[in-house]
Amino acid sequence: MKVSIFITCVADVFYPEVGKDVVEILEDLGCEVDFPKTQTCCGQPAYNSGYVKETKTAAKHMIEAFASSEYVVAPSGSCAMMVHEFSSLFSESEADWKKKATELGNKTYEFTQFLVEVLGKEDLGAELHKKATVHTSCHMSRLMGIKEPPQKLLKCVKGLEVVSLPHNYDCCGFGGTFSVKMPEISEQMVEEKVKHIMETGAELLIGMDCSCLMNIKGRLTRNGYPIDVKHIAQVLNEDRKQGGI
C-alpha cells in the first residue's frame, strides 16, 4: 500500500518530529511512504479569509502534487478537511478540475482515521505511563465526523490513563486566521480551554492538530502551567515494542 504524506504547514515548520513519527508508524505497518516535494499549503487561510480565487490556485497545485498518490494521509483533521472541500471550489464548467478534486478528497485521510478505518489497526504496541487528556479539533470532529479512531488508539497505549476533558469539542480559539482577526475573543476561548485542561489534573495534553496544540501550548506556557503537549502520532510512537504492531 502506497501512502503519500501531506505534512501541512504547521507540522512542517514547527513540528517536524510529528511528520517523522507518522512516517515511522506507517512504514512499520507495511506502507510504502513518500513525500511529494511539490506540495504546499492547502489554501485554508485564504479560504477562511474569503480569497476564493487564491484558494483555487492552491487547490490546483495540491491536486497536481498528489495526482499519482494511492492514499494521502495528513496529521491534521483541519487540513484534511480542506482537501475534502476542494471540489466545492469548482463550478460545473470546470468539470475536469472538479473531478480531480473529488478524487483527491476521496483518497485523503486524517492520520488516526487512516490507521483505524483503512489499516484496521488499534494497538500499535505503544507504552507511555502518563495521565492525559485529549483535545479534538473542530474540523476533525464536526466536519469530518472523526471521534472514535483517536479514542480506540489511545485506549491501547499501555500505561496511559486518559481522563475526560470537560467541553472537549469546544474550539480552542485558534481557527487559523480567526485568532488574528479576532484576538480578544480567541484569547478568551483558549483561556477557557486551558481552564478545563487544568481541571482534569492531567500532566499531558494530546491532540490531533498541531495548530490547536501550538495555540494551547502557548497559553499554558504563558500561564506557567507545567503540562506537556504532544500530537497523537508522538504518543503512538512512544516506546513501541518490536513486533508490537
Swiss-Prot record:
Alphabetized InterPro entries for the sequence: Cys_rich_dom, LutA
Which cysteines are disulphide-bonded?
none
Q: Name one GO molecular function term.
A: oxidoreductase activity
GO annotation, cellular component aspect: cytosol
**Residues that span the membrane, as ranges:** none
Protein family membership: Belongs to the LutA/YkgE family.
**Which PANTHER family does the UniProt entry name for this protein?**
LACTATE UTILIZATION PROTEIN A, UNCHARACTERIZED PROTEIN YKGE
Name of protein: Lactate utilization protein A 1
This chain's source organism reads: Bacillus mycoides (strain KBAB4) (Bacillus weihenstephanensis)
Taxonomic lineage of the native organism = Bacteria, Bacillati, Bacillota, Bacilli, Bacillales
